[in-house]
């Protein structure tokens, strides 16, 4: 990989990305603690060939990745015994950045928490919720999340494109991705329809995807186009076209609580904040018994009060992860993962409230979303929970 040239392009972004900036030492968490950190080929070669201060700093602290030919995963940092990047100083700031400059960071470190996709030749940029500043910028706005187009300069070789979709290549095929834009707009509109609770919106979304898959299996593409057109023209009357009573309502069962409090789960968690959080929950020996006696409905008022946070989080996930096309052609699996992610966040907030009387507040919701997201994004510990219909 050679150094790229600086280009100009239009980027489609959630509006919060326009003002997002890393707050560095003012951040309550550190980006790279607890994670495997990959090094792209360009940066790896720079480390290998440097003769000066950079070489002195990095020697013995990185390795070539012998298991991957991917230029973005060409090498990786040698994580310390306490699961931290070897370049984090005592103030949890990056030594490479501080002593040698941002230009000597790997693409992962330079670009985090930004996510880049290309949809029909349009660049898209959004933010990962494992970053507390992204959570604050994106989710605490009580207005509906909006999307804008801006022009930006960028080095094509210094960004990692997560997903590329060319919906026009599938026109007149049997693949639902040909309707990508209609499905995406409708999905976001459903999640932003405040006439329904968050659980109802997720159920409507699941029913919508179920309808699409059923019609696709019948090869009834005229009906699919008719459904998309009707919903697009009458977005406020969504339930006239989608009967969400046909899907199991989104709810949290006692079995779900049992699973997410399992000690085996705790032992596999990587993120420091989540590990401490779950460890504290597991100290309460009576927590599960207390759940059975607790009137969970009494918390609905608080969850409804802060529903805009969950709405913005879910809309961001839909946009960032290209939902429902992030699991191949299995729309049902995609929506189940989104629902289970929401259930995880809500369940841990409920458990926290019962265990230590911590209130359901903006601050605590953001804490759980950010802490949980570090493991959801960078480890497989929650994979079974996300992919099963629990």
Give the label of every model feature segment.
Residues 195-390:
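Hydrophobic, aromatic-lined core segments that form the binding pocket/scaffold
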Residues 41-45, 52, 181, 185, ...:
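Generic alpha-helical secondary structure signal
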Residues 1-92, 96-106, 110-155:
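N-terminal cysteine/histidine-rich coordination modules
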Residues 111, 119-122, 136-150, 177-184, ...:
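Iron-sulfur-associated redox domains of electron-transfer enzymes in respiratory
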Residues 3, 12-13, 28, 32, ...:
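Generic alpha-helix detector with strongest preference for long hydrophobic helices that associate
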Residues 1-9, 160-164, 297-304:
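Short, mixed-charge, low-aromatic patches
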